[in-house]
A protein has these predicted regions:
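C-terminal transmembrane helix and the adjacent membrane-cytosol boundary/short C-terminal tail
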Residues: 168-172, 176, 183, 252-291
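Transmembrane alpha-helices
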Residues: 166-167, 189-224
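Transmembrane alpha-helical segments of polytopic membrane transport and secretion proteins
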Residues: 1-21, 280-291
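Generic hydrophobic transmembrane alpha-helix motif, especially the helices
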Residues: 114-156
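Cytoplasmic-entry segments and transmembrane alpha-helices of multi-pass inner-membrane transporters
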Residues: 14, 89-128, 291
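Glycine/proline-centered hinge or cleavage motifs at structural transition points of membrane proteins
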Residues: 120, 185-186, 199
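Interhelical loop and adjacent transmembrane-helix boundary motif
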Residues: 223-270
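Transmembrane alpha-helix signature in integral membrane proteins
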Residues: 68-96
């Protein structure tokens, strides 16, 4: 009797987990279908080439234009810049915290990183708008500090907690025996960390980079507050608009074709994120198979 009861409970638990997993899949499918249904009509009316490669966005003009190439390039440049700044800093910090830092320093820094992860996006944007934007204007002697550079710096800071925490967890999970064997062969601790521990934790570090990319390309509020939110072609010291901020800034008052075009932008952003994640996962799996 007890065996049957345990089996029933086990089956019930498995059923609950299966349902929860299916709910997650269903949510993704619903979002995908909704974006496709809502975004395709505008692309059909505007024209795929004009929509993706048009350089002019004047959605509220008497004769509106709906070219999103500036938004696409700005999102690519902004994300790439944030990754180039944030990943090296986050990676080196994670190696230090996981392998080199004294316990007291580690505890303080880890708490600070956790606090950084919990700060709302609007606070990042507010601090960036009040401190970073004027600083860029003064240091580089430009008319307006609200620019692509300001957005890159803010995004780089925002992705640091994800990169540091995930990379650190992966490095701490490397078996101690690997490092002991390296040290026994005469390698220094630093050589061991970078030639043994880091390669062993590369899957987790790659996952941290994927999380960082997702956070950077999906951010809207903080970016909108420091980038100027003007639909220009991207330049480092010029006010720009990202894919996310284009949707966030106009959706509240949009209607008709303009509203449909914003859904099309959301669809492009969604596909863009899926493409990046798929590419990074493919490269990671190929690296595993070659290794």
């Amino acid at each position: 009797m007890k065996t049957q009861t345990k089996k029933l409970i086990e089956n019930a638990v498995h059923g609950v987990f299966l349902i929860l997993g299916l709910v997650t899949v269903a949510a993704v499918l619903m979002i995908t279908v909704y974006l496709i249904v809502s975004g395709i009509p505008a692309i059909g009316k505007i024209g795929l080439t004009d929509f993706l490669f048009g350089r002019k966005w004047t959605s509220t003009a008497a004769e509106p234009s709906y070219g999103i190439l500036p938004f696409i390039l700005t999102s690519i440049y902004g994300t790439a810049g944030a990754i180039l700044l944030g990943v090296p800093v986050g990676f080196m910090a994670s190696v230090y915290l996981a392998k080199m830092a004294p316990a007291k320093i580690k505890n303080v820094v880890v708490e600070a990183v956790s606090l950084l992860a919990g700060i709302p996006s609007v606070v990042y944007g507010l601090v960036g708008m009040m401190v970073l934007v004027p600083g860029i204007r003064r240091v580089f002697n430009v008319p307006d500090g609200a620019s692509l550079l300001a957005a890159i710096i803010v995004l780089a800071i925002m992705i640091l907690p994800s990169i540091i925490k995930v990379s650190m967890t992966s490095l701490e999970a490397v078996p101690r025996e690997y490092e002991d064997a390296s040290l026994a062969l005469g390698a220094t601790p630093t050589e061991t960390y970078f030639r043994v521990s880091v390669p062993a934790a590369k899957s987790g570090i790659a996952a941290a980079v994927v999380l960082g990319v997702g956070r950077a390309i999906g951010e809207a509020m903080a970016v909108m507050m420091v980038s100027g939110n003007v639909p220009n072609m991207p330049e480092l010291f010029r006010s720009v608009r990202f894919l996310t901020t284009a949707v966030a800034s106009e959706m509240s008052y949009s209607s008709g074709l303009q509203r449909q075009a914003l859904f099309s932008i959301a669809l492009v952003l969604f596909l863009f994120i899926m493409l990046i994640n798929a590419t990074l996962n493919f490269l990671l799996k190929r690296d595993k198979s070659n290794g």
